[in-house]
């Protein structure tokens, strides 16, 4: 498998950073005296040194379970590419797919909800065609990435089954604990401003209500987990909306992640390497987003 195909399957996620700006400094570079003499001495004075301390979880990728069949992984080429890139996170089961996903009964149909009364189970795909929780966690261990598991907060609200949704999330946490999977980071839904989320777009306040219904129960089960929220793909231009979210659910959110996809749907590996920062999706670049 070539890297262009890898790029088409895995999408980047930027999570966060901190900046440190020390005071001015002076650096002197000197060539060997025996070669060129004192005239070669160069002094460079800098008004400021800009240093950034970034999280080793800054860059991650999606595993879209409904689009990444098991056959994709058998050769080992894709797994090796992931190890070579060394992402901080591998996210599962995907983005918008997470708003439809029921981990105990994956159907392979990423944008359809098993809880929909009109859902036809005859359309389910064989489980050997897609990655399940155990296969995902095995991949995480082999690649050295941090697991990032999604919680479906949408289905319960859409179908008036909120408590069932919470119990589903708690069973997933218990399953991971019982299997020895150490999962610290959990993301809630995905970009619910988009209309293709399960139940359609929701306001920041409504998303906050969804988070509040789940997170206290999850942290009661495991107080050490970190909750990741994401109402919109970007943050810098949506501060007002995020203020609305924080007003409702800030006490239950530990991290906000932002999503930057280089040339969505068309990018190649070579284009990604050639354009840094890559900034054609949603206007700016990941660099300006986290600046």
Locate predicted features.
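Bacterial N-terminal signal peptides
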Residues: 8-19
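Positively charged n-region of N-terminal signal peptides that target proteins for export
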Residues: 1-5
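Hydrophobic, well-ordered secondary-structure scaffolds
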Residues: 18, 248-249, 281
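Non-catalytic accessory regions flanking glycosidase/transglycosidase catalytic cores in CAZymes
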Residues: 23-188, 192-238, 247-255, 287
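Glycoside hydrolase catalytic-domain groove-lining segments
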Residues: 126-129, 263-291
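Histidine-centered catalytic micro-motifs
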Residues: 258
